[in-house]
Regions:
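C-terminal cap/substrate-recognition subdomain and adjoining C-terminal extension
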Residues: 2-22, 41-166
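Hydrophobic "anchor" residues
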Residues: 27-29
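Basic, amphipathic juxtamembrane/active-site segments
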Residues: 32-38
Length: 166
């Protein structure tokens, strides 16, 4: 996906100077995986994370969805949200664990964006490599491993999706 096609308020040349990575399953969507996300997506969005996504987009940050699902499964979400980039699983490269961190780092390098200016939102210990790649990690929910890192690193925290949304 072309990450420089939109004019952005944070850089007169139209290039983003910051990025925000959003884990999809269990973070942006209240459902833990896309197979559980039946029916209209609107009721499955996790409102605080969706608000953060729109806030980053308004600032002209590169908005990136990160998911263990494949591109076909993500199609309804990408249609609704129109992210600048999507990092998702391919048959030869699942997007899990360290793969999320590697993919985020590669995208930042490709776009010339400093990691210190970037954000990542994630909900589980397996996402720690993604959170470790940015200057502003945000823990969503109450995963004990992530909460320990959040306390040590003074990371922001957002509440977990409520049970009735899952």
């Amino acid at each position: 996906m072309d990450t420089t096609s939109r004019t952005r308020p944070d850089d007169r040349r139209g290039r983003p100077t910051a990025a925000a990575f959003f884990d999809v399953e269990g973070t942006l969507l209240a459902a833990p995986d896309l197979a559980a996300a039946t029916g209209p997506l609107g009721r499955l969005w996790h409102p605080p994370v969706l608000a953060a996504l729109h806030g980053h987009a308004a600032l002209g940050h590169l908005v990136v969805l990160v998911a263990r699902a494949g591109a076909t499964e993500l199609a309804p979400i990408t249609r609704d949200l129109a992210p600048d980039a999507v990092l998702c699983s391919r048959p030869e490269a699942p997007m899990i664990g360290q793969g999320k961190g590697y993919a985020a780092r590669a995208l930042l390098r490709e776009c010339g964006i400093l990691a210190a200016r970037c954000y990542a939102y994630a909900d589980e210990a397996a996402d720690l490599p993604l959170l470790a790649e940015v200057g502003h990690p945000v823990v969503v929910g109450d995963d004990p491993v992530l909460l320990r890192h959040a306390r040590r690193g003074n990371w922001r925290r957002l509440p977990a999706p409520s049970a009735e949304r899952k």
